[in-house]
A protein has these predicted regions:
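Positively charged n-region of N-terminal signal peptides that target proteins for export
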Residues: 1-5
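Hydrophobic h-region of N-terminal signal peptides that target proteins for export
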Residues: 10-19
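Alpha-mannosidase-like glycoside hydrolase catalytic domains involved in N-glycan trimming
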Residues: 21-126, 131-133, 137-142, 149
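Solvent-exposed beta-strand/loop surfaces of large extracellular or lumenal domains
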Residues: 54-80, 258-264, 305-324, 344-350
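Beta-strand-rich recognition/accessory modules
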Residues: 69-86, 341-417
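Solvent-exposed N-terminal domain segments of exported/luminal and surface proteins
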Residues: 95, 100-227
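Extended, loop-rich substrate-binding clefts of extracytoplasmic carbohydrate-active enzymes
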Residues: 194-277
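Acidic (Asp/Glu-rich), glycine- and aromatic
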Residues: 269-275, 280-313
Length: 417
């Protein structure tokens, strides 16, 4: 599945002829399932960097697109857009015009991302102003309390997430009542007036658990935090208008921790969290600097107190339950939250699905040569929009359909016009 997906991502070749200033490409997006799909992401890796792009549908209507510089070299090498809907067994066709010059076109933002330092001169939790794009810390340095909302946060109008900047690297979640972008206003911490006005809030306590799909080590039969790294970098590398991408680099990680390792045994692990407009799931891509087949890892979901469990025994796991989203000492102004959590790991990478314990629904994963893609998702019972999910059965039905969607992505084909 991973190989098939990567082929679809890298299908756009020879994007710019050396003698031309512009080039047109035909892109077909084909749904091979017998059900309709919505918010279908299309991500194309460009062979040559470009300055601007224009995407038109089959009716000649311009649709929003996004150019990204994901490797930080100052050049746009990735193009993405989102197809609103594709019928069962149907295809949609687009014309992509790429130009060496110009700037990316402006569109109404459908996603948002932020990362910031805590400004101790500002007491309000939703008016912080020390925005940054990236931060690197050395081994043994923990910036968790220096960063507002403890790491980068990102959202679309359905869901919001944040990644903790410490050895846990947990994905935590923010549930919404309505479909709207909110983090610029609430900064993950809505005040009482914002709550009264219908803004969302943190809906999950994660502690040292996996939260929603954190990837960690596995050694000596136990989950291990990403404790021993030469350096750790978290960056917001794409901010919209259609997708956000958060990049996490654990450089020189000792995968044998708490045992020691040689310098040669250390490995770099780079993780990308990608959230597209119109979707409640997040795509997680993990890359290693060398063959990692011998390394075992762990991931999973927090065991929400009293939750019901779902598993297909082949990499898909979920739970639905209700608990306080914060510790007891911080519970004033909060209510118990009901959430559904889901994770989908390629079955080929699952070494074992462990029984639930008091903290987690865990997996041991591995058999990864250089890369692995998995997906995480959630729903909040607070959702009042039509796509809202409000029961364990409805959420588990969604998980089964979601797995088909992510494991059988639309086929993307490209040709020179």
């Amino acid at each position: 599945m991973m190989k098939k997906t990567l082929l679809s991502l890298f299908c756009l070749v020879a994007a710019m002829a050396t003698e031309a200033q512009t080039a047109d490409m035909k892109v077909a997006v084909s749904n091979q399932l017998s059900v309709s799909r919505t918010a279908v992401p299309v991500a194309l890796q460009l062979e040559s960097p470009v300055g601007s792009a224009l995407v038109m549908d089959a009716q000649g209507v311009e649709i929003p697109c996004q150019l990204d510089d994901l490797d930080g070299d100052g050049k746009y090498e990735s193009l993405s857009f989102v197809v609103k809907e594709i019928g069962p067994k149907k295809s949609c066709h687009f014309t992509v015009t790429l130009s060496e010059s110009g700037q990316p076109r402006k569109y109404e933002p459908q996603v948002y991302a932020e990362m910031m330092l805590t400004n101790k001169k500002i007491k309000s939790s939703n008016k912080q102003n020390l925005y940054i794009s990236s931060l690197t810390v050395d081994n043994g340095t923990n910036p968790y309390w220096m960063l507002h909302h403890h790491g980068p946060a990102f959202e679309n109008d359905m869901v919001a997430d944040r990644i903790y900047f410490d050895e846990r690297q947990t994905a935590d979640i923010y549930g919404k009542y309505r479909r709207a972008l909110e983090l610029r206003d609430t900064q993950f911490y809505p005040d009482s007036e914002q709550k009264a006005a219908g803004y969302g809030d943190d809906v999950l306590w994660v502690g040292k658990t996996f939260g929603v799909g954190a990837l960690r080590g596995w050694h000596n039969g136990e989950m291990q935090m990403l404790q021993d790294v030469e350096s750790r970098t978290l960056s917001v590398v794409a901010r919209g208008p259609l997708r956000t991408v958060v990049k996490v680099v654990d450089k020189g990680w000792n995968a044998r921790y708490p045992d020691t390792c040689t310098a040669e045994e250390r490995i770099d692990m780079t993780t990308y969290y990608t959230l597209y407009a119109g979707r409640r799931d997040c795509q997680v891509d993990v890359f290693f600097s060398r063959d990692a087949s011998e390394i075992e890892l762990s991931t999973g979901l927090v065991n929400v107190k009293g939750s019901k469990e779902y598993s297909d025994g082949k990499g898909l796991r979920g739970c639905w339950g209700t608990d306080w989203p914060v510790s007891e000492k911080d519970s004033v102004g909060h209510k118990r939250e009901t959430v559904g959590l889901g994770i989908c790991v390629p079955s080929s990478n699952v070494i074992s699905e462990l029984p639930a314990d008091n903290s987690n629904y865990p997996f041991v994963v591995g058999k990864i040569a250089k890369a692995m893609r998995y997906h995480i998702t959630f729903a909040s019972d607070n959702e009042t929009f039509p796509e809202g999910i409000h029961s364990a059965k409805a959420f588990f039905d969604y998980l089964a359909a979601w797995k088909r969607d992510v494991e059988q992505p639309c086929v993307i084909s490209c040709s020179r016009r």
